Amino acid sequence: MHCLPVLVILLLLIASTPSVDARPKTKDDVPLASFHGADNANRILRTLWNLRGCCEDKTCCFIG
């Protein structure tokens, strides 16, 4: 019970702080997710299907 007021105060302080980027964005900045998101998702799904042994006869494989 002694920690509850401290926790509430910390949460209020964290919520009221302004968000500041460590490095200002330039016009050339592009999020990395746009480069790697689809490739990583396809690779992970393909690996999971291959682990199940499902893609050998292509009857239940939804990728490629």
Swiss-Prot record:
It comes from Conus tessulatus. It is found in: Secreted. Expressed by the venom duct. Residues 23-51 form a propeptide. InterPro entries: T-conotoxin. The cysteine framework is V (CC-CC). This is Conotoxin Ts-011. Residues 1-22 form the signal peptide. One of its GO terms (cellular component) is extracellular region. The modification Isoleucine amide is found at residue 63. Contains 2 disulfide bonds that can be either 'C1-C3, C2-C4' or 'C1-C4, C2-C3', since these disulfide connectivities have been observed for conotoxins with cysteine framework V (for examples, see AC P0DQQ7 and AC P81755). Keywords: Amidation, Cleavage on pair of basic residues, Disulfide bond, Secreted, Signal, Toxin. GO terms for molecular function: toxin activity. It comes from the Eukaryota. Coiled coil: none annotated. Belongs to the conotoxin T superfamily. Pfam families: Chi-conotoxin (PF16981). The keyword RNA-binding does not apply. The keyword Heme does not apply.
